[in-house]
């Protein structure tokens, strides 16, 4: 019975649909598309022109999103809080972190947590909870001769290890071992491990860096690799703030990818008293040429690096642009990218 009713319904519908009229080549209000050459290539070129135009126009559009009031530091911070909230949202810093008393020491029966000793500090392998099953790992440099003068999160580039910027393994010049130098000057220093740029085939398919692989996975969850790494940094800020109270002096300093995380973390968290950025600060108008894991949806609508700096203000922001990471990622199924110092990019 159901099949008979369905057939009757289909027949009644077809009986009222007019037959197509011969000789009509276009729909009303349209005209035939006439293009010469490779249509697909022309489409890509048109999209490219449009996006570059939008990037160029984004700089002038940003002002409408800002209502800065510089009458006092407190009033200023309140006036830019909507921008700070927007930045947190697009970076994926939206989840509640796991509270903890202190980082746990990482040791085994073959390797103690104390991995090295300096003239004025001890170095421990540590890990700390962040979100759910996500933990931060790295090295903690603790002064041995006096109470810490400040608490600093020192963030290496993605192609550096905590051991390298602490001077424990080769790979970073002595003058650039900033975690070691901070500890030598009486700071307690936490050095997180970042996801690296190691490039390899994934599932025997496209060759992706470790960062691009996790960037793509996090995108499906409505989050961002940058956001997860920021949570690791801010979990350390939570700990420093709890231990030091209102008098805690907290700083972040990073190089390359670490400089990016330092700038973002100071922009979104006013508990950070001072921020140092090395090998990152500059124009983001060529963001499309940088590693894809730096891509943040809607970022340039409100934020270039200069706008991020205004979120750090009036707290001190130190920018050191003498050296930048040099990265060249070929396209082997993943996104190609080039990183170089701005002056080198201009020479090219």
Label every model-predicted segment.
Residues 4-15:
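Bacterial N-terminal signal peptides
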Residues 264-267, 284, 301-348:
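Serine-hydrolase catalytic core
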Residues 168-171, 205-210, 268-270, 290-294, ...:
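Short secondary-structure boundary/capping segments
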Residues 147-243, 249, 255, 280-291:
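Cap/lid segment of the alpha/beta-hydrolase catalytic domain
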Residues 23-63, 67-68:
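Preferential activation on post-signal-peptide N-terminal prodomains/segments
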Residues 235-311:
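Primarily recognizes the serine-hydrolase "nucleophile elbow" in alpha/beta-hydrolase
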Residues 18-22:
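Boundary at the C-terminal end of the N-terminal hydrophobic targeting segment
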Residues 53-141, 235:
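Non-catalytic accessory segments flanking enzyme active sites
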């Amino acid at each position: 019975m159901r099949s008979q009713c369905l057939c009757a319904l289909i027949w009644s519908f077809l009986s009222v649909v007019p037959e197509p009229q011969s000789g009509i080549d276009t729909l009303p209000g349209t005209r035939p598309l006439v293009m010469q050459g490779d249509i697909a290539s022309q489409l890509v070129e048109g999209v490219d022109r449009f996006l570059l135009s939008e990037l160029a126009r984004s700089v002038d559009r940003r002002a409408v999103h800002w209502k800065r009031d510089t009458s006092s530091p407190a009033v200023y911070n309140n006036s830019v809080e909507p921008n700070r909230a927007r930045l947190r949202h697009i970076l994926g810093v939206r989840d509640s972190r796991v509270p903890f008393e202190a980082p746990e020491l990482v040791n085994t029966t073959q390797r103690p947590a104390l991995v090295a000793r300096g003239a004025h500090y001890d170095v421990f392998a540590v890990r700390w909870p962040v979100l759910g099953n996500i933990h931060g790992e790295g090295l903690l440099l603790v002064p041995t001769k006096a109470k810490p003068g400040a608490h600093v999160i020192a963030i290496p580039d993605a192609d550096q290890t905590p051991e390298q910027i602490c001077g424990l393994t080769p790979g970073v010049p002595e003058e650039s071992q900033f975690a070691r130098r901070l500890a030598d000057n009486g700071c307690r220093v936490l050095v997180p491990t970042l996801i690296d740029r190691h490039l390899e085939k994934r599932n025997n398919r496209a060759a992706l860096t470790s960062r691009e692989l996790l960037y793509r996975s996090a995108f499906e969850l409505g989050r961002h690799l940058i956001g997860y790494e920021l949570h690791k940094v801010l979990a350390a800020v939570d700990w420093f703030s709890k231990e030091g109270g209102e008098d805690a002096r907290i700083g972040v300093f990073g190089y390359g990818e670490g400089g990016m995380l330092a700038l973002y973390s100071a922009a979104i968290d006013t508990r950070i008293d001072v921020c140092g950025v090395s090998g990152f600060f500059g124009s983001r108008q060529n963001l499309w040429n940088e590693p894809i894991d730096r891509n943040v949806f809607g970022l340039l609508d409100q934020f270039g690096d200069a706008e991020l700096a205004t979120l750090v203000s009036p707290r001190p922001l130190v920018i050191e642009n003498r050296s930048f990471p040099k990265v060249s990622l070929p396209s082997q199924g993943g996104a190609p990218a080039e990183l170089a110092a701005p002056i080198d990019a201009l020479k090219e």
